Swiss-Prot record:
Recorded metabolic or biological pathway in which this protein acts: Amino-acid biosynthesis; L-leucine biosynthesis; L-leucine from 3-methyl-2-oxobutanoate: step 2/4
Annotated source species: Pseudomonas aeruginosa (strain ATCC 15692 / DSM 22644 / CIP 104116 / JCM 14847 / LMG 12228 / 1C / PRS 101 / PAO1)
Keyword Transcription regulation: no
Enzyme class (EC, first level): lyase
Cofactor dependence: [4Fe-4S] cluster
Protein's name in the database: 3-isopropylmalate dehydratase large subunit
Matching Pfam families: Aconitase
PANTHER family membership: 3-ISOPROPYLMALATE DEHYDRATASE, HOMOACONITASE, MITOCHONDRIAL-RELATED
Cofactor binding note from Swiss-Prot or TrEMBL: Binds 1 [4Fe-4S] cluster per subunit.
Keywords: 4Fe-4S, Amino-acid biosynthesis, Branched-chain amino acid biosynthesis, Iron, Iron-sulfur, Leucine biosynthesis, Lyase, Metal-binding
HAMAP family membership: LeuC_type1
Entry GO MF terms: 3-isopropylmalate dehydratase activity; 4 iron, 4 sulfur cluster binding; metal ion binding
Family: Belongs to the aconitase/IPM isomerase family. LeuC type 1 subfamily.
Length: 474
């Protein structure tokens, strides 16, 4: 009998009941809430006269709608200009107070983006099932946890029952072997993977990322990789547990301690795929061949190395692909065969649940140190992923490096990743962004998003156009 994959093990650990229609009932260990997808769920509980099944399994924080300027944050919820945004943040506070759920409110130093806060607090632990009303919940799979996004109706189901109806996925292994070149990061790995398999490549699969290059990554780098599993079509991304995982979790507020810690570690050490486990699909990449990546189009799969040129639709024989390239070039305002390094930028955004952790800010600051944001850049934002990340960065003096270079140093939140708060692009503007999606209008109506790593974003800010960051780090 073949061994089990990590995904198989996690599924079996949480299986409550297999149903005749092929679906199953699985138990949920951790539920993370934010202000956008939770209001209707809480209202559903009230209408049904229910209470959360396990209050202690839930934590919450506002992130999507919160303003990131210090002036707006000092004014509290009342200072949020947009009426809908203000109402959503206020409603989360009220719902968490009413139902007794732990919430890190807008001006709590522990507040931040849900997928930064969960791991930071130790609320995400190896072997858990973790859900949140946000598609980038796959981030938490970096801890060997089965984590994925859910819809608003499912948020209510989890609150009420601590269970979820789901169908088991297929297994995909993405194996990245070798050593990454200097200046090439976890973000470049995952963009290269998406460029290789496409945004539908992982459909119906849970992706396990493995290989020496993945093992060499820090936990924060692994979170970046798992975060963008959904852009590769997979709801779930996973990395096996190792000593780095255990060291990261130890001593965090929600982590077990004393005897329970030893018991937990003994369990966690088995959260790896068996040597003889079988995967439905295997994809292999050579880390040494990966270069700094830049997305050029309106889908994360439209990505190239920084030294390449955007495609020419005339050279594409497939009429569907040709049409897709033509539409993307038109929206992005680019020419066929235009060099990536010839793309003029208007704004730079360093932040989001993909790249706003302390390691990301250190990488960007290393590039920004002693340099100035180019005069052609209208705005360069640095938005830490949480108040604790911001606090740590300020202790290290990273804020001063950014401010002296001409960047704006902001308060934590989702910020310019999506146009749900005051940080957004104007129509026609090009932005080098460390976020995860470059769809039409994602950062603002008519805005043009280019996905890059934090180091590449900082390099673009000081150069005014894309440049291979390795030229600045040499």
């Amino acid at each position: 009998m073949a061994g089990k994959t990590l995904y198989d093990k996690l599924w079996d650990m949480h299986l409550v009941k297999q149903r005749d229609d092929g679906s199953a009932l699985i138990y949920i260990d951790r539920h993370i809430l934010h202000e956008v997808t939770s209001p209707q769920a809480f209202e559903g509980l009230r209408l049904a006269g229910r209470k959360p099944w396990r209050i202690d399994a839930n934590i919450a924080t506002p992130d999507h709608n919160v303003p990131t300027t210090r002036t707006e944050r000092k004014g509290g919820i009342a200072a949020i200009a947009d009426e809908v945004s203000r109402l959503q943040v206020q409603t989360l506070d009220e719902n968490c107070d009413d139902f007794g759920i732990t919430e890190f409110k807008m001006n709590d130093v522990r507040q931040g983006i849900v997928h930064v806060v969960g791991p930071e607090q130790g609320a995400t632990l190896p072997g858990m099932t973790v859900v949140c009303g946000d598609s980038h919940t796959s981030t938490h799979g970096a801890f060997g946890a089965l984590a994925h996004g859910i819809g608003t109706s499912e948020v209510e189901h989890v609150l009420a029952t601590q269970c979820l109806v789901a169908k088991k996925m297929k297994n995909m292994l993405v194996k990245v072997e070798g050593r990454l070149p200097a200046g090439v990061t976890a973000k470049d790995i995952v963009l290269a993977v998406i460029g290789r398999i496409g945004t539908a490549g992982g459909n119906g699969h849970a992706i396990e990322f493995a290989g020496s290059a993945i093992r060499d990554l820090s936990i924060e780098g692994r979170m970046t990789i798992c975060n963008m599993s959904i852009e590769a079509g997979a709801r779930v991304g996973l990395v096996a547990v190792d000593q780095k995982t255990i060291d990261y979790v130890k001593g965090r507020p929600f982590a077990p301690s004393a005897e329970q810690w030893d018991q937990a570690v003994a369990c966690w050490q088995g959260l790896v795929s068996d040597a003889d486990a079988r995967f439905d699909t295997v994809v292999e990449l050579d880390a040494a061949q990966i270069k700094p990546q830049v997305s050029w189009g309106t889908s994360p799969e439209m990505v190239l190395a920084v030294d390449q040129n955007v495609p020419d639709p005339a050279r594409e024989s497939d009429p569907i692909k040709r049409g897709s390239i033509e539409r993307a070039l038109k929206y992005m305002g680019l020419r066929p065969n235009q060099a990536i390094t010839d793309i003029q930028l208007d704004r730079v955004f360093i932040g989001s649940c993909t790249n706003s952790r302390i390691e990301d800010l250190r990488a960007a600051a290393e590039v920004a140190r002693g340099r100035k944001v180019a005069a052609t850049i209208k705005q360069a934002l640095v938005v830490p992923g949480s108040g604790l990340v911001k606090e740590q960065a300020e202790k290290e003096g990273l804020d001063r490096i950014f401010i002296e270079a001409g960047f704006e140093w902001r308060e934590p939140g989702c910020s310019m990743c999506l146009a749900m708060n005051p940080d957004r692009l104007e129509s026609g503007e090009h932005c080098a962004s460390t976020s995860n999606r470059n769809f039409e209008g994602r950062q603002g109506a008519g805005g043009r998003t280019h996905l890059v790593s934090p180091a590449m974003a900082a390099a673009a800010a000081v150069n005014g156009r894309f440049i291979d960051v390795r030229e600045l780090l040499a």
